């Protein structure tokens, strides 16, 4: 539950509409989140380099991965992310990463530059 204090601060910082405590209950000293929160969430293991686009998503989280790729490979991965997002979907990348140099940069707007969150605005 100690880590939930930091999560609560982040939740408030990003202007959550309720209290974070509304989404979980304490059981045996642990925070157990309401299972309904995961009803529309899918976690996938995916090869960013060799894998093909396999679905459309509202949100893609890919933090601190692309810093290990050269610029050409980063651009290929961002192309796949672009193709995988619904219009107005969100992409969150690592704090040291950027879309500035990307061929697809004009198809996204910055939602939060500090946290590197982008919104797809063009197909």
In which residue ranges do the predicted regions lie?
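Extended basic-aromatic, gly/pro-enriched interface segments that bind polyanionic ligands
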Residues: 1-59, 65, 73, 99, ...
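ABC-family nucleotide-binding domains
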Residues: 70
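A short glycine-rich, Lys/Arg-flanked "PGG" loop and its adjoining helix->strand segment in the class I
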Residues: 75-87
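Conserved beta-strand signature within the Rossmann-like core of class I S-adenosyl-L-methionine
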Residues: 87-95
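Short secondary-structure junctions
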Residues: 105-111
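Short hydrophobic/aromatic beta-strand or adjacent loop that forms the aromatic wall/cage
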Residues: 112-117
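Flexible, glycine-/basic-rich loop-and-beta segments that form/coincide
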Residues: 123
């Amino acid at each position: 539950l100690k880590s939930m204090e930091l999560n609560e601060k982040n939740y408030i910082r990003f202007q959550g509409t309720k209290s974070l405590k509304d989404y979980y209950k304490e059981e045996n000293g642990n925070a157990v989140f309401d299972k309904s929160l995961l009803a529309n969430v899918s976690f996938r293991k995916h090869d960013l380099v060799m894998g093909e686009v396999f679905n459309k998503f509202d949100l893609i989280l890919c933090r601190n991965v692309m810093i290990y790729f050269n610029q050409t490979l980063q651009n290929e991965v961002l192309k796949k992310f672009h193709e995988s997002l619904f219009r107005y979907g969100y992409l969150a990348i690592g704090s040291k990463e950027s879309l500035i140099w990307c061929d697809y940069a004009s198809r996204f707007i910055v939602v939060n530059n500090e946290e590197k969150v982008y919104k797809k605005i063009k197909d």
